[in-house]
């Protein structure tokens, strides 16, 4: 009421006219969401390296089976937005060079330990920065036009209960710059450059690893760039709130962290092959 009175005074408007105008439903915003465009698999099959392509958007589908009757066509003109929120979850920011990452477990059982190493591990902060930009671009609801009030991040922000991973994720959401490197400056130190670690994708030359046989590309300089770059984030434009996930408090999201694991995480050696574990 106070805000409406102030606006009326500033604009020289009759409060009796301004009130009803403010109470009118907002118009849907033209923002980039999956209503406009989606991402689909371009390549055929699920065995080899897969590429992606843009695809048409997906419209809202009224659940008339739940409603039990036809929807009122005039409902779109009467909509009110209780609140418009952004949602992120399972970001899994990774310190890909941490001695506590047990990548060789993948060689023992690729299915059981699928999360121990993935080709994109060094790029998680880049992905999160782009998620922030996409969230900011959707500042107004595509359904009602209501402004975004806040963003909720529902857990698994850090992948391994790591203070560094937690710091990086907070910095990206807050709009701080960072260099995602916990080792020697400008140098990636990990299984993706170790020749004996055939369980990992080697972007410099994947011919000798498991991924090369499935068509994974050669990308020279990728790892050096990943740990040398400064990741710039514009930061979320609205307040954000987070809750705990299992990866935020447990090792690999499953195991209690004891003294031996803590010593491994803070040590200066990193296992390359499964027998070393």
Task: Explain the meaning of each model-derived region.
Residues 2-150, 158-243, 249-277:
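Acidic, histidine-bearing metal-coordination/catalytic regions of metal-dependent phosphoesterases
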